């Protein structure tokens, strides 16, 4: 190629590139002008387009045009603004037996995996589903710090929660608050959790709401300020919580504290016939909250607190039925007592328990053994709340008497798509010390069941771990 041809070739190439660049520039200018006017057509350029994707999430797309660049940002936002406070208007569902809901097998799994040492477990639900809760000991079953976890109170305990059905581990547990006594409940908008911590003679409570500490409560009697060890219940934003401070074997100071969004609305001293209150198991229906508690001082029959959350008032009495449900307890008497404790039982002064009191649809839970925390059974006892002669008409074994049980408590999925509130309960399956002293730890697994209108058979849902494998 001679020099003239080279010049012509280079010139043609340059002109071609110039034309292409010009066309690209024109296209870019047109695109930016078009986008500018498209955004400008809306009344407010900062107003996002909202596209609902499901009942719990919203996708927000923000279109912002600056300096001829268009940025599109996708934000996933929980639709808390569309939630409303839980309203306890429904009745309890009819229950003829109990079906299995969940079993975490924590001790069996912990023989090999990293599973937290826990006790005082419970379940609590929210609009998204149900979670398991427990007070962690800040160590695992195979950890050396598991030695001494038989003790209830230490600076290392925390209320943790995890997905229902899983075993609690350092990898799936969420810390709700720090302490050695707890309760937690959801009001339909956000969760309130309360933890007690500190020394026996000067403990305090910290109230969390929406993931932040909101209120602190000091000890009022200087003797182990403590609370329910299972879920509280809310109605129209008001969440009553039962707390006790004082002796475990004598008259103590119990208060019902009414919270809204973690802030105290009212405090009531315990009134009525109940003489000692600890570890209440509460549920709600028909705009009333009922708490079935533990009389650790005198009664083998359980005290009952009935709360009107709208009026923020309460009354207390004892479960009238002759079927005694605390442990330890004497043999069932000929007559119950609505107004006073029925004494007797040896050696343990009591255990956390529950009942669902709904006229003919009433159910009581108790250990099968009257002397120790072994076995567990559910008894349908019509009118147990009001009739001193009431006895069982239906019986279902939950844990056979050859296996350990422990605390038990009530919970309900108040957001389930039903015409009624279906009663549910859990049983703590304690393993390790003091009954099994060949290991250094004390921990538990959990089994949970819910009501069924069908008549289902019994089975033993015991823990099932072989302690010999931990040696």
From Swiss-Prot:
Region (Involved in apical transport and lipid raft association): 11-33
Glycosylation sites (chain numbering): 51, 54, 63, 68, 71, 87, 147, 202, 403
Protein name: Neuraminidase
Region of interest (Head of neuraminidase), ranges: 92-471
Residues at the catalytic site: 152, 407
Gene Ontology process terms (BP): carbohydrate metabolic process; viral budding from plasma membrane
Binding positions for substrate per the UniProt entry: 119, 153, 278-279, 294, 373
Substrates-to-products reaction catalysed: Hydrolysis of alpha-(2->3)-, alpha-(2->6)-, alpha-(2->8)- glycosidic linkages of terminal sialic acid residues in oligosaccharides, glycoproteins, glycolipids, colominic acid and synthetic substrates
InterPro entries the record matches: Glyco_hydro_34, Sialidase_sf
Originating organism: Influenza A virus (strain A/Gull/Maryland/704/1977 H13N6)
Post-translational modification: N-glycosylated.
